[in-house]
Amino acid sequence: MAVALALAAAMQPAAAADDLKLGEALLTRNCGSCHAIGRSGDSPQKDAPAFRTLGSRYPIESLEEALGEGVMSGHPDMPEYKFDADDVGAIIAYLKSIQQR
């Protein structure tokens, strides 16, 4: 039992790193043409908020439902996005990791 717990604990950082990489890749592919995805830089579309500032607008966790059910925007230029549960978890983990403090 102790070996299994130690193995699971050792695997968590790798899984977390994989989630961060997946979240960043999903956001870059689906959102990067308009939004700044990383910890720095300007959004390609000046009116699109940088994702590192989303936490100042609302709790990042509040995006979970919208990402899973379909992100819809109030403007016609933004397409609707819908992600599966694993992708949502990765996106939320990545967004939390880049928030400005």
Annotate the PLM regions.
Residues 20, 28, 86, 98-99:
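Localized chelating/binding microdomains
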Residues 22-24, 38-68:
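Gly/Gly-Pro-rich "capping" loops immediately C-terminal to redox-active cysteine motifs
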Residues 23, 28-37, 91:
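The canonical Cys-X-X-Cys-His
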Residues 29, 54, 58, 73:
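Residue-level signal for short amphipathic helical patches enriched in basic/charged
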Residues 45-53, 66-98:
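Axial heme c-ligation environment in periplasmic c-type cytochrome domains
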